[in-house]
From Swiss-Prot:
Organism of this sequence: Streptococcus pneumoniae (strain P1031)
Protein name listed in UniProt: Aspartate--tRNA ligase
Enzyme class: ligase
GO terms under biological process: aspartyl-tRNA aminoacylation
Family matches, as Gene3D superfamilies: Bira Bifunctional Protein, Domain 2 (3.30.930.10), GAD-like domain (3.30.1360.30), Nucleic acid-binding proteins (2.40.50.140)
Amino acid sequence: MKRSMYAGRVREEHIGQEITLKGWVGRRRNLGGLIFIDLRDREGIMQLVINPEKVSAEVMATAESLRSEFVIEVTGQVAAREQANDKLPTGAVELNVTALIVLNTAKTTPFEIKDGIEANDDTRLRYRYLDLRRPEMLENLKLRAKVTHSIRNYLDELEFIDVETPFLSKSTPEGARDYLVPSRVNKGHFYALPQSPQITKQLLMNAGFDRYYQIVKCFRDEDLRGDRQPEFTQVDLETSFLTEKEIQDITEGLIARVMKETKGIEVTLPFPRMKYDDAMALYGSDKPDTRFDMLLQDLTEVVKGVDFKVFSEAPAVKAIVVKGAADNYSRKDIDKMTEVAKQYGAKGLAWVKVVDGELNGPVAKFLTGIQEELTTALALEDKDLVLFVADTLEVVNATLGALRGRIAKELGLIDNDKFNFLWVVDWPMFEWSEEEGRYMSAHHPFTLPQEGTAHELEGDLAKVRAIAYDIVLNGYELGGGSLRINQKDLQERMFKALGFSTEEANDQFGFLLEAMDYGFPPHGGLAIGLDRFVMLLAGEENIREVIAFPKNNKATDPMTQAPSTVALKQLEELSLQVEEDETNKTN
């Protein structure tokens, strides 16, 4: 029979109606001769009642054979429950079953289909189709669908054009490693899966599209963590003839629309703006979490005269004050934080506690001469814990920024109901890479430099600033954008500053440089990480929880066993040969 409605949508208004439902058996209970079944579908749970006095012996026998995750079809009359269940939207009603059909049976599942399970991540991914039956996973993906629907409606209203760009593209050097796809037809040549549609969307501006968007899959072969995946989705925008502020206004409107339609939250516009240098100085991060205080305090000049060379001779000394937390952290706890500090390049972590108005701790004796000045500078009070790092400015900021976030989580200082958006602006154009031994693009090599600093492309690259902007939410980079270079000579200077020879630039980006000979308009845009945005809206800590079929931290899929070896014939067709070892053999 045709399904009347979803089980999770049956309400008191349906009492007395005969309906047909289809779904999965969640739980089965025998009470006083009656059989109670929780029927589950994507919209929720409905209680079924099977009374031996009101059904045939065949229906009763079928009901007694049911096990968890059997797929069934039931017909019956909606009735009011004697005792309502306030925890369920359907809790005021139940279905008195008159007909029951088993559509499919099921083996015992490797974990219960319910929220709050304790199965490990790889087991959940191995049986992802079962994991996705759980209500919280269904809700996460329904939220994701609502977010994308809201985004599309908003951008369509603003006359953005949805354009698909190629997945098989050209490998270019800047950024993370590419996923390469060998060409069978052009032997020895490779496509790259795009890390973003950056260049193609810029070319669409040259083609006169004016406003482009795409909700697009992107690929990066990089080390994974909780908010990264080898394939991810971004909301990609590009516009012509707009200023930085106009692009930001459009983005703020988009986020405000999504927040209102999916969370019922009215966000305050415009979002705050913070310069990159201020974010690093005060929060130790280019993606500051502004939901709590505990700002970094610069003490470099204050400690210059102390008889402690670690402080007095350090390029930079900063501290964070953990208010009233002296008793929360033992020496052993602080030793653990010291190990965290070392992960960020710090040689150690100095600390003092304020006890009865005095400084106590390993370095307190070196600070007696400046205790009053230090107390004033840090606004110290009894029971405060002070953590110091002395090193290069980069190490100091990174270390204290990481400790700041860790401590806030441990002490419950973060209001998880807050959504604090802000723009980080006035970025450096380049950042120094110790690994590469050269300057790299902080964003990408197509970013427009600020006019007053562009002359440093042939001078001190550290002084070049970009017309770039990142949007940050609760300590996560939600997205980033910039105005782009549209003048050929400036783009060539940018490539040269990054170490490209003329030949290399033409080989890698010649098509873009050629396009700049044909009236390339001023343009700029932005991309928002959809997975990360939905993760934060859903209150999750890992983007796997909002992606239907993600990879694990080894970039593998435990369900399909991808990536896998392939037949030797396939490799021969591609003119490829794999060096074999015990862990990597072709079939």
